[in-house]
Design a protein with these regions (language model features):
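Conserved nucleotide- and phosphate/pyrophosphate-binding catalytic cores
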Residues: 2-166
Length: 166
């Protein structure tokens, strides 16, 4: 939208730059598709530790037999290790490739605890926040946004030759 406006009326908006980290991976859900709340295959910070454990345990892995060597990059559970178990990621990949650990162990070991621990600050903070606090933050943000956007909207109206009412 900003690019189209700028090309039509003039340089009013800054074009945002992508800020992608090459280390970020798409995390697949328990069915192998992209993890998504709409697919119902996600792990949410709102889930309890028990729910996280059950969801991780239900992930589909890539090996057919326990003796088969695995490919960690084909396994959605390894996506979770890459996101939540950075210290143990290399060892998990090695054990998968060598078939020295069972997929079930990979899912039920420390991984669910690591995920739950990473979400614990969120859950604690969420419990502390009241509805009144949220409304106060929204009001303050609204006031600040109006100050910033009123100047920008004046500039936009000028570019579009719609500032004749002043």
């Amino acid at each position: 939208i900003a690019r189209k406006f700028n090309s039509t009326y003039g340089e009013a908006f800054t074009i945002p730059e992508a800020m992608l980290d090459s280390d970020i991976v798409m995390i697949r859900g328990r069915d192998g598709r992209k993890m998504s709340k709409s697919y119902g295959n996600h792990i949410s910070p709102d889930h309890t530790e028990e729910e996280i454990y059950e969801r991780v345990k239900s992930f589909v892995t890539d090996r057919k037999k326990l003796s088969d060597e695995g490919d960690p990059y084909e396994c959605p559970v390894f996506d979770l290790h890459r996101a939540f178990n950075r210290d143990g990621e290399v060892e998990v990949a090695r054990a998968c490739r060598n078939a020295t650990s069972k997929c079930y162990d990979c899912k039920t070991g420390e991984l669910p605890d690591l995920i739950a621990d990473s979400y614990s600050d969120y859950r604690t903070r969420k419990a502390e926040i009241s509805d009144g606090f949220v409304l106060d933050v929204l009001r303050e943000g609204n006031i600040k946004a109006r100050e910033v956007t009123s100047e920008k909207m004046d500039q936009v109206r000028k570019f579009m030759l719609m500032d004749y009412l002043k």
